Amino acid sequence: MDNQSGIVMYSTQWCGDCVRSKKVFDKLNIKFTEIDIDFDKDAYEIAKKLQNQNPRIPTIVFEDGSYLVEPSDVELIDKLNSL
């Protein structure tokens, strides 16, 4: 699997699931952009829109427009392997 670009993870500093997902990206050497929705109002609004006005984190958006919300490690790895 090549390093992916165009992957965006909406997160916060206090989110344990976000830390876990970042470890998956690091372990697989996958590049991604992390945006903290506590500090970026526009990013918060994007996450909110994707989830019917109730944003949950992490929300991970892929280049093809698909996204995962609070994925397990297995779900995230499966998605990354399918890219």
Write out the residue ranges for each language-model feature.
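Short, structured active-site "lid" loops
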Residues: 49-69
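Class I S-adenosyl-L-methionine
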Residues: 19-22, 26, 48, 77, ...
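Residue-level detector of anion-binding/catalytic polar loops
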Residues: 31
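Non-catalytic, surface beta->alpha helical segment in thiol-disulfide oxidoreductase systems
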Residues: 62-83
